């Protein structure tokens, strides 16, 4: 695909920005187009009412290419880092479909203000029996807060709130390979944790692309299954970058109890459930041992499926002496 005049005008300005604010960005148009060819988003997002939300949009190159391929009615760049905002101010004035919402993407209220008060983004509501075909989210979560935010986004998918209140909204998210590796850790692999289980519960997630230097960090079965685009390790591309495609799915699990049990069990994930069940609360052993399948009790938490966790959570929900549920959220004031 040839470079448009808009992209040609953006590239030199974007490449002059020498800070990434702790994030990593793929800025090679050839690689970005190769990834978008694999995703084939054009075959699904055909509506003239399409809206795109770009979270931590950064140096604009991917955003321009995505915009020109999908031609959305509105493309909101949620970004408040100074050098990137200055880039948008210098380049977007002749491209009305692309607007910068200059507020902090890390703050929950930013998204409420964007959709409810300022109405910069106004997605349609769609039923939860298909992937939303008029709303797409892209995000770059490669900074130090990235994995924490990724977990929060998964919770929002599972809880059907935040941007996911509009329906099952596909997300394209850049993350470090360390986070991606956890997402695709198979049963009985010690990389499995709460992130893995939450992803399996609420989404169908695919590995779309990963850096050449990161390939060996994934199990061969994962690479064979997804056949990701391999980003070459050269001076044009970061060496620790993975892109995942998150396709939310509906579920009927009681997430409060499930999440509490998952968090607790993963603290001692290398011990059999029957040996560490007291971590759910004082007296748990007396309640759970006779009510759970003996086969399940002998498993270690990293060997469990999200449905097996749900079996434990259902017994937990009936426990008269269960502790109060404490839900962890990210700290908006964290540095």
From Swiss-Prot:
GO terms for biological process: methylation; transcription initiation at mitochondrial promoter. GO terms for molecular function: DNA binding; methyltransferase activity; mitochondrial transcription factor activity; RNA binding. Its main location: mitochondrion. GO terms for cellular component: mitochondrial DNA-directed RNA polymerase complex; mitochondrial matrix. InterPro entries: KsgA/Erm, Mtf1, rRNA_Ade_diMease-like_C, SAM-dependent_MTases_sf. It is found in: Mitochondrion. Its EC number is 2.1.1.-. It comes from the Eukaryota. S-adenosyl-L-methionine binds at residue 79. Keywords: DNA-binding, Methyltransferase, Mitochondrion, RNA-binding, S-adenosyl-L-methionine, Transcription, Transcription regulation, Transferase. Belongs to the class I-like SAM-binding methyltransferase superfamily. rRNA adenine N(6)-methyltransferase family. Mitochondrial transcription factor that confers selective promoter recognition on the core subunit of the yeast mitochondrial RNA polymerase. Interacts with DNA in a non-specific manner. This is Mitochondrial transcription factor 1. It comes from Kluyveromyces lactis (strain ATCC 8585 / CBS 2359 / DSM 70799 / NBRC 1267 / NRRL Y-1140 / WM37) (Yeast).
